[in-house]
């Protein structure tokens, strides 16, 4: 300014001094504004915090003594916002109104007050669940009644200390103690500040169910279908356990086949602690029925060794359902269950026997069902397939591989010993319980076509007859050759299928005897050991006895015996002759009639001369295209079987050809080659003619 004054008259000095005055004024104004703003913010902060505190205190005071959890009831606090907005008339207001009355006072207190309210405010905002305030033991049960709510000192510090006392019981340790030692008066004495855990779900408090928000049980559990496990203890738990400690509702959707009203969660949730005790939860096994009906690999089958579910699985596989379906299996989803690799293991699993061995109504029904014979029995008879009885198929593995190729995969193992992966070749005596799997859709189609015809032999007549469930009469086999019925673990397990046999197997044309697998008796006098020659049909009793016969005879160990060594001494098909035509199976055609060599591609079946009893493994039904290659590979070693790959891969059950010729590398390649076509045009022709009939 001295320089400016020297430079000019007063106007110069004025102009020089003006900017300074302006800047000073501006600075002063800004300072004032900042102070006022700060003071205003402080006041608003105080008001807001005290209002929240007072509101919370009032809520806590009016709230029922059973405060249900460690999270605040956000719904109620939200609905009470109007109260937050409305002015609070209390000693706090009067003391505060006199406190901030002028700018000067604000400015004087500014440095101190700008910090303290924030500090206090954050003190209760920051209290995390594990802060010391939370971890302190809960106050005595009568504290709520002894506290003088109306006489708050004007000092705000005490007010801000209240939240810690209120929130104290929200800590985990306090939860544990209050859960384990509930006192009727004070289960959860006070609410937590909404700012701390605003995510509390509305309507969860036991003491007060907010009408706007349904309780968790109503939301998550359908009252009609699922029992609420904690319903019975609601009265006790409402006063003793914070709802937050309960499992709100683990909604496990039951499989459609499962009774819906079985409680999914056991009521034993009272084990204390803020985490639910999951040890007692029984989750239902994975859906035995695939959600996608076209799905071929059954999740339940995936556990080869968990045979406990096997009968369950079998039921879902349609053994109970599909078997009863009638001529047409409507079980698209039932594609060859055998295709699952794990099935093999389960087959070899002795326990399987137990689960399957008991003739459960389902199994029996499925076996006995007439439709079964065609599709399930029929697709293939393993060397000793006891096709004779559909129920037998139960004993036998009747994999629903409608394509013979499918069965052939099973059959494919010439050396039977290897046929089941699980069965060590000749000596593992694992009783194979029959695994009767329904045929897939292809089977259904086929069975529909065939059943009317009485199983016109779709494959070579013999095969078809087998397919049709024509029982192989093993009784004709010399006893050493004859397969004993499956070694059911307990003789009692014998399937009482005889009654069913007539139904299922005996088609009009079929003598009941043909339905039976004569494992029980020696060769019937009339029967010849070779299937090629017709023999008089035995009494239907055959079926009965063979079926009822304890399956104890069959052992997996015998599979080896399936090695098809002597063609002549092989299995004999029970029916007088399986005529190639539908009659072959006793279909419409006459039962008698020597079999066409075509039928079994010859004595190949007979090759299965089994020196010992062997399980009947019947693969029936469509194997889905995915029929397990492992099974095919396992069976591929059996010297007598050749499966056309087309059937194997494509699931063209009728198209597959079961040939008893030794399987060479080419045969193995065929098995793995999805594109392989049936090599024999004659066979194709017979298939076509079958369809035309």
Curated annotation (Swiss-Prot):
Phosphorylation/dephosphorylation states of Ser-171 are required for regulating transduction of CREB activity. CRTCs/TORCs are inactive when phosphorylated, and active when dephosphorylated at this site. This primary site of phosphorylation, is regulated by cAMP and calcium levels and is dependent on the phosphorylation of SIKs (SIK1 and SIK2) by LKB1. Following adenylyl cyclase activation, dephosphorylated at Ser-171 by PPP3CA/calcineurin A resulting in CRTC2 dissociation from 14-3-3 proteins and PPP3CA. There is a cross-link at residue 234 (Glycyl lysine isopeptide (Lys-Gly) (interchain with G-Cter in SUMO2)). The modification Asymmetric dimethylarginine is found at residues 51, 99, 120, 123, 161, 168. The keyword Transcription regulation applies. Changing residue 70 to A: No effect on cAMP- and calcium-regulated phosphorylation. Pfam families: TORC_C (PF12886), TORC_M (PF12885), TORC_N (PF12884). A motif (Nuclear export signal) lies at residues 271-287. Most abundantly expressed in the thymus. Present in both B and T-lymphocytes. Highly expressed in HEK293T cells and in insulinomas. High levels also in spleen, ovary, muscle and lung, with highest levels in muscle. Lower levels found in brain, colon, heart, kidney, prostate, small intestine and stomach. Weak expression in liver and pancreas. GO terms for cellular component: cytoplasm; extracellular exosome; nucleoplasm; nucleus. The modification Phosphotyrosine is found at residue 488. Residues 331-378, 386-415, 509-529 have a biased composition (Low complexity). GO terms for biological process: cellular response to cAMP; gluconeogenesis; glucose homeostasis; positive regulation of CREB transcription factor activity; positive regulation of transcription by RNA polymerase II; protein homotetramerization. The modification N-acetylalanine is found at residue 2. Residues 1-30, 282-306, 328-554 are annotated as: Disordered. InterPro entries: TORC (IPR024786), TORC_C (IPR024785), TORC_M (IPR024784), TORC_N (IPR024783). Binds, as a tetramer, through its N-terminal region, with the bZIP domain of CREB1. 'Arg-314' in the bZIP domain of CREB1 is essential for this interaction. Interaction, via its C-terminal, with TAF4, enhances recruitment of TAF4 to CREB1. Interacts with SIK2. Interacts with 14-3-3 proteins, YWHAB and YWHAG. Interacts (probably when phosphorylated at Ser-171) with YWHAE. Interacts with calmodulin-dependent catalytic subunit PPP3CA/calcineurin A. Interaction with COP1 mediates nuclear export and degradation of CRTC2. Belongs to the TORC family. This is CREB-regulated transcription coactivator 2. It comes from Homo sapiens. The lineage of its organism: Eukaryota, Metazoa, Chordata, Craniata, Vertebrata.
């Amino acid at each position: 300014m001295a320089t400016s004054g020297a430079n000019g008259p007063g106007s110069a000095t004025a102009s020089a001094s003006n900017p300074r005055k302006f800047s000073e004024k501006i600075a002063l104004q800004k300072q004032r504004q900042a102070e006022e703003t700060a003071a205003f913010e402080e006041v608003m902060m105080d008001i807001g915090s005290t209002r929240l505190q007072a509101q919370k205190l009032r809520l806590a005071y009016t709230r029922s003594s059973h405060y249900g959890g460690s999270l605040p009831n956000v719904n109620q606090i939200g609905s009470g916002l109007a109260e937050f907005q409305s002015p609070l008339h209390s000693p706090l207001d009067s003391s505060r109104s006199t406190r901030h009355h002028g700018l000067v006072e604000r400015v004087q207190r500014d440095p101190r007050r700008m910090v303290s309210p924030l500090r206090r405010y954050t003190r209760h905002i920051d209290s995390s669940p594990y802060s010391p305030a939370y971890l302190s033991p809960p106050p005595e049960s009568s504290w709520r009644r002894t506290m003088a709510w109306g006489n708050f000192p004007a000092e705000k510090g005490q007010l801000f200390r209240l939240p810690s006392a209120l929130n104290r019981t929200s800590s985990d340790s306090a939860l544990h103690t209050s859960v384990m030692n509930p006192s009727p008066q004070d289960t959860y004495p006070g609410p937590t500040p909404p700012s701390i855990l605003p995510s509390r779900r509305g309507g969860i408090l036991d003491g007060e169910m907010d009408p706007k928000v349904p309780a968790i049980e109503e939301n998550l559990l359908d009252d009609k279908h699922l029992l609420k496990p904690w319903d019975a203890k609601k009265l006790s738990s409402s006063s003793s356990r914070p709802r937050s400690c309960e499992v709100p509702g683990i909604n496990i959707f039951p499989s459609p086949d499962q009774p819906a009203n079985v409680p999914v969660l056991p009521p034993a949730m009272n084990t204390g602690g803020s985490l639910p005790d999951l040890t007692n939860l029984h989750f239902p096994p994975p859906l035995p029925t695939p959600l996608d009906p076209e799905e071929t690999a059954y999740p339940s089958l995936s556990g080869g060794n968990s045979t406990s579910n096997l009968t369950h699985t079998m039921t879902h596989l349609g053994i109970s359902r599909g078997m009863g379906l009638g001529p047409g299996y409507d079980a698209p989803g039932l594609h060859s269950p055998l295709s699952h690799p794990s099935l093999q293991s389960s087959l070899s699993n002795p326990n399987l026997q137990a689960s399957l061995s008991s003739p459960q109504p389902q199994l029996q029904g499925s076996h006995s069902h007439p439709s079964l014979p065609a599709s399930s029995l029929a697709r293939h008879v393993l060397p000793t397939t006891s096709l004779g009885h559909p129920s037998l198929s139960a004993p036998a593995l009747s994999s629903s591989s409608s394509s013979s190729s499918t069965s052939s995969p099973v059959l494919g193992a010439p050396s039977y010993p290897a046929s089941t992966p699980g069965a060590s070749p000749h000596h593992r005596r694992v009783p194979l319980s029959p695994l009767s799997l329904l045929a897939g859709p292809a089977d259904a189609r086929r069975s529909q076509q065939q059943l009317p015809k009485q199983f016109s032999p779709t494959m070579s007549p013999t095969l078809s007859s087998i397919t049709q469930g024509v029982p192989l009469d093993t009784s004709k086999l010399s006893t050493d050759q004859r397969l004993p019925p499956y070694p059911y673990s307990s003789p009692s397990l014998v399937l009482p299928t005889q009654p069913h046999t007539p139904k299922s197997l005996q088609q009009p044309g079929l003598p009941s005897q043909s339905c039976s697998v004569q494992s029980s008796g020696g060769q019937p006098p009339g029967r010849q050991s070779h299937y090629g020659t017709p023999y008089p049909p035995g009494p239907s009793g055959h079926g009965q006895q063979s079926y009822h016969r304890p399956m104890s005879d069959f052992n997996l160990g015998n599979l080896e015996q399936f090695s098809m060594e002597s063609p002549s001494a092989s299995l004999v098909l029970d029916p007088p002759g399986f005529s190639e035509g539908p009659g072959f199976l006793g279909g419409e055609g006459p039962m008698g009639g020597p079999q066409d060599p075509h039928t079994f591609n010859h004595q190949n079946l007979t090759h299965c001369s089994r020196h010992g009893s062997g399980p009947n493994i019947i693969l029936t039904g469509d194997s889905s295209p995915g029929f397990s290659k492992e099974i095919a590979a396992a069976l591929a070693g059996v010297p007598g079987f050749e499966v056309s790959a087309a059937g194997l891969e494509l699931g063209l059950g009728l198209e597959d050809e079961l040939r008893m010729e030794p399987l060479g590398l080419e045969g193995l390649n065929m098995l793995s080659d999805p594109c392989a076509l049936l090599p024999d045009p004659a066979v194709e022709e017979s298939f076509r003619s079958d369809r035309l009939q």
